[in-house]
C-alpha cells in the first residue's frame, strides 16, 4: 500500500529461493554502468534481489530517490535497486519528511517540528524510527550538546547503515545491491579527476601505526593514535557493512562481518543505540586493530569531514571493501592512498613473499635480485602501473578483475627458482637466511606458512627446489632439504616445537562449523593444520590406528622414523584438530550420518592404498603381493625376516623401498626388474644408489611375463620379456616387447610395484562425486570442490600417486576452499592467492661473486645402520654445516614494489622478518583531507591541471 514499506522483497528473502535465483542471475545477467560518453558491462551480482519497478511506482519514493541520488551525473533513469531499497526502508510519510531535509545539514528536534509541522512527539518517533532503519543518523555536535538528526550522504552513510544490522539485511537483501552500486556507479566517471587526499570522497587509508611511529615528518592525522586520543572513551565495534553486503550477494570473503568497524565519537552512540554495535574499550580497539593486521586488513578512516573529524576506523578486506574498490577497480589510487609509499631494501630482502601475499593493491610482487645479461648486467627494471594523472582515462584502463589480478605473486620475468619449483612454494630463500642468522624458531615458523610437515619433508621430499637451484649452475645446488631438516628438528622436542597461533577472521575467537577430514595422510594433515590455524576444530577420521597414511605405512622407518610423524601430528592436535582412529568412513559411519551430526564439509584424502598386478599367469599365488601391502606389513611390525630370494617388479621409488626393506629383512638375493632403461627409471639416482649399497640388484628393460609355481602352488620363479619401448611417440604409456628375448629367474616371492589404486569402498555411496581415469576423483583444479558441493578432495585420490609435498600443497589450498565454503555467501575463487609463480631465467642471470665453499653432506652413521637397520642412520646437519651451507645461497629473488600501485597501508611492514620493507612519506599531499562539500571545487581544480598535462604531454 502507498503508505507502507514493502517488506522483505515480496518474500523473496527465503534462502532456498534466493539461492536458486542467485544461480540463475549469474548465469548470464549483466548490468551496464552508464555515464556521459561511456558504457561498461559487468556481471550483475545481486540482480535476484531487484524486482522490476512497478508500472506505477510510489511517487514519494521516486522523489526520495531523486533527492538522495542522481547528484553528480544527474541521471534521468530510475534504478531498480535504488527504488526498492528506499521503498522497503521508508513509508511515504517518512519519504516526504526526508525530502524536506537537506543532505548533511543537522536538524534539532525544534527545527524538525518547524520543518514538518508535525507534533513534537510524532516527529521525534519518526526520526528515531528512520535512524533505527538507517535512513538517518544523529549526533550532538553543537554547543548545547542537543541531539540533532542528519540525512547522510549515501556512501559513507545510509547505504552502510542499511547493511550494518544483519537481521535487517537478511530481511531486505536489496540493501546489499544498493550499497554495492551506490559506492561505484556515481564515481565511475569522476575517479580520474580525484586529487591526492581523496577530495572528501569516501574513505582514506591510514597506515599501520608502528610502520610510521618513527617518521619525524608525519602529521597527527596520519596516526591512528591521534584519532583515538581525540575520541577517547567513545568507541563502538560494529558490523562491517561491506562484508555483510558482499556475503548476501554470494561474493563474501569468508570473514565474519561482526565487529571489524570501529565507530568513534557520537557515531559510537548512534551504532549502539540503533543496535548496530556495542561499546568497546581502548584496549579492545587495540586488539581489533592487531587482529586486523594479523589478517591483512587495511585500516581506513572516513574522509568526508575534513581533517578535524572522522566517525569510523574500518579494517578492510580488499576482496569485499567498496571503499578500496574505488581505487582498485578504476586504477585511481588517489581515492585511497595515504601519504606513504612502501620501499624495499633489496640487500635485506629474501623474496619470502610475505609482503606480496598481504599487499591489498598488488603493488608488491616477487622479482629478482640477481643482475640480468639482457638488462646489460643490471637488475631488470619492472613495469609500473599507468596512472590517470596525465593520461586520458576510461573503462579500458580499469581493472575489473583486480581482486584476482592483485593476488598474482610474481612478475612475468620470474623470481627465485627454488620457491617457484616447490609445489607448496615454501619461502626457501627466506628460511635459509633466517637459519644463517641463527633465528631457527622464526625459520621454522616461516616454513610452516606453507608446509606444516617440515621434519617429515626433510627426510622424504624429492627436492624439486634443489633441482631448480641457481647455485646448481655454478657447482652444486644448496642442500636446502638438509637445512630444512635441521630447522624442523625443533618440532621433535616439546620445548622447542612451533605451534602457530590462530589467525582467524572472526572476532569470536574461532569458527564453530564442523569439518571432517577423511584420511590422515599428508594432504589430510595439511588441511587440518591450516583449518586449525584459521580457527576451526577439524575432525580427522583415519581407518588405521596411527596417522600419516603412506608416510607411516609406506615409507621405511630407516628413512622416516615414526616418532617424527607423531611429533608433527601432535602440533596439529595442539592447534585444535581432533583425531579419530580406527574409523573407516563409508563402513563405520556414512557421509550422510556425519552430515546429520552437523558436519558442514568433507575433505577426502584417503590416498592410493591399493596396489596393481600385472595381469600375468601365476600372479594370484600366495607369495605374490603388491608393494603397498608389503610395505604396510613391514611397517606394522608383522614381518621379522624375509629369507630366500625376493624379486621386485617395478622401477619407481616405492619399488626401491620394497627392495631395501627386503635386503634389511635378510633376503639372500634381492633384484628389481623394470621396463625402463637406467636413464628412464622413475626412481632417483640417489635412491638407486642407496638400494645398490644395501645389496639390491637392478635389471632394466624387462617386463613380467609369467610367475612360476612349484607343485605345492608356491612361487619358485618368474619369467621376464625384453621391453623395447615404454612410451609411444605421443609420450603415452604403451610398452612394446620382444617376446623372443626371455629371462627366467628363481624367486621365493614376487612383489609387484607397478602402480597404486584407490580403494573407495562405500565412502562415496550415494554422492555425486565423479570419478575419472584410474578411479581418481574429479574436482575443480583450483578449489578441489567436487560435483557434491560439500565434498572436497586432494592428494593421491585426485592426482594419482605423487609425492608428499604435492599432497601438502593440495591440502593447504583445500583448507582455503573449505573455509570459504562453510562461511555463508562466500566465493571460493575471488581474491585468493593465485599461486602463479614463475622462475627467473637462470641462463640469463649474472653470477659474479659467491661463496666458493662446496656443498655440505650429511654424515652417514654406518655403525648405527648395522646395529639397528630399521632406524634412521643419516644424521642431521650440525649448526656449523648449516652456517656453511646457507652461505652458499645466491639470494636470487627480491620483492619489487610498484609505487604507482602502493596505497601506503603499511601491512607489508608487519609481515617482514628481515626489516627489508619500510614506509617513506613521499606523498604528503595525500594527507589533504577536505569536507565533502568541497568535493566539486577539488575535483574541478585537479581536473584542470590534469587536462593541461594531457594536452601538453606533461608528467
Residue locations for each model-derived region?
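Glycine-rich dinucleotide-binding loop and its adjacent helix/turn
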Residues: 487-508, 534, 567-587, 611-665, ...
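Beta1-alpha1 glycine-rich phosphate/pyrophosphate-binding loop at the start
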Residues: 426-429, 435-436, 477-481, 517-585, ...
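A short, conserved structural fragment
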Residues: 131-142, 364-365, 917
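Ferredoxin-type iron-sulfur electron-transfer modules and their immediate structural context
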Residues: 6-18, 22, 26-27, 63-65, ...
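A Rossmann-like FAD-binding core segment of flavoenzymes
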Residues: 563-612, 625-642, 664-774
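Short, amphipathic alpha-helical interaction segments positioned at domain boundaries
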Residues: 145-184
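Short acidic, hydrophobic short linear motifs in intrinsically disordered regions
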Residues: 104-116
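Short amphipathic alpha-helical interaction segments
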Residues: 116-132
